[in-house]
C-alpha cells in the first residue's frame, strides 16, 4: 500500500511540476534545473542513486536560487547517508543549512548520524568519543525540534531520557 501511495505522489508531483513549468515565469536555465531536480527525485525514489546524483549535480550547476539549491544539496546528503558515506552526507547537509537554516529534516539527519556514530563508538568502548557524538546529536535535535516542535518525538524522548534536555528547554 505504501509503495502505491509513493508512486501516486511521485506521479502527481511530476504532473504538477510539468504544469508549473509551463505556467510560471521562469528562465530557460531555471526550467532546466528544475527538470534535472525532478528527474533526480524520481530516480532517488526508485532507488537509482547514481542516476539521482547525476541529475542533482546537473541541477546544482544551473540552479541559482539559494532556497532551491538547499533542497538539492539536502537530497544529495540523503543519498550519501543511505549509502553509508556519513562524512559526505554531513558535508552536504551543512551546505544545505548554510543556504537555508530552516531545514529541520537536515538538522534531524545530522543528529541521527551523530547518534549512530556515538552508538558505534560506545560499542568499541570509546566512551569520550561516544559522549562527544551524543552531545552533537542532542544539539542538532534541539535545533530541529525548535523548528518543527510537533515532529521528532523519538528524539524528544531520547533527549528527556538521557538528561540532555534541561527543564528550561520545553518545545
From Swiss-Prot:
<dbReference type="Pfam" id="PF00515">
    <property type="entry name" value="TPR_1"/>
</dbReference>
<dbReference type="InterPro" id="IPR051685">
    <property type="entry name" value="Ycf3/AcsC/BcsC/TPR_MFPF"/>
</dbReference>
<keyword id="KW-0472">Membrane</keyword>
<dbReference type="InterPro" id="IPR019734">
    <property type="entry name" value="TPR_rpt"/>
</dbReference>
<feature type="repeat" description="TPR 2">
    <location>
        <begin position="70"/>
        <end position="103"/>
    </location>
</feature>
<dbReference type="Pfam" id="PF13181">
    <property type="entry name" value="TPR_8"/>
</dbReference>
<dbReference type="GO" id="GO:0009535">
    <property type="term" value="C:chloroplast thylakoid membrane"/>
</dbReference>
<keyword id="KW-0150">Chloroplast</keyword>
<feature type="repeat" description="TPR 3">
    <location>
        <begin position="118"/>
        <end position="151"/>
    </location>
</feature>
<protein>
    <recommendedName>
        <fullName>Photosystem I assembly protein Ycf3</fullName>
    </recommendedName>
</protein>
<keyword id="KW-0934">Plastid</keyword>
<keyword id="KW-0793">Thylakoid</keyword>
<dbReference type="GO" id="GO:0015979">
    <property type="term" value="P:photosynthesis"/>
</dbReference>
<keyword id="KW-0802">TPR repeat</keyword>
<keyword id="KW-0677">Repeat</keyword>
<comment type="function">
    <text>Essential for the assembly of the photosystem I (PSI) complex. May act as a chaperone-like factor to guide the assembly of the PSI subunits.</text>
</comment>
<dbReference type="InterPro" id="IPR022818">
    <property type="entry name" value="PSI_Ycf3_assembly"/>
</dbReference>
<dbReference type="InterPro" id="IPR011990">
    <property type="entry name" value="TPR-like_helical_dom_sf"/>
</dbReference>
<keyword id="KW-0602">Photosynthesis</keyword>
<feature type="repeat" description="TPR 1">
    <location>
        <begin position="33"/>
        <end position="66"/>
    </location>
</feature>
<comment type="similarity">
    <text>Belongs to the Ycf3 family.</text>
</comment>
Amino acid at each position: 500500500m505504501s509503495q502505491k501511495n509513493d508512486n501516486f505522489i511521485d506521479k502527481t508531483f511530476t504532473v504538477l511540476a510539468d504544469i508549473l513549468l509551463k505556467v510560471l515565469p521562469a528562465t530557460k536555465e531555471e526550467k532546466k534545473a528544475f527538470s534535472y531536480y525532478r528527474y533526480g527525485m524520481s530516480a532517488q525514489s526508485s532507488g537509482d542513486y547514481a542516476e539521482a546524483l547525476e541529475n542533482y549535480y546537473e541541477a546544482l550547476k544551473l540552479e541559482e536560487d539559494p532556497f532551491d539549491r538547499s533542497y538539492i544539496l539536502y537530497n544529495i546528503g540523503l543519498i550519501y547517508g543511505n549509502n553509508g558515506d556519513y562524512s559526505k552526507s554531513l558535508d552536504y547537509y551543512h551546505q544545505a543549512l548554510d543556504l537555508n537554516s530552516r531545514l529541520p529534516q537536515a538538522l534531524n539527519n545530522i543528529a541521527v548520524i551523530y547518534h549512530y556514530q556515538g552508538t558505534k563508538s560506545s560499542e568499541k568502548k570509546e566512551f569520550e568519543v561516544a559522549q562527544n557524538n551524543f552531545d552533537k546529536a542532542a544539539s542538532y535535535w534541539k535545533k530541529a525540534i525548535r523548528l518543527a516542535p510537533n515532529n521528532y518525538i523519538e528524539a524528544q524522548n531520547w533527549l528527556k531520557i538521557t538528561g540532555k534536555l534541561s527543564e528550561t528547554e520545553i518545545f
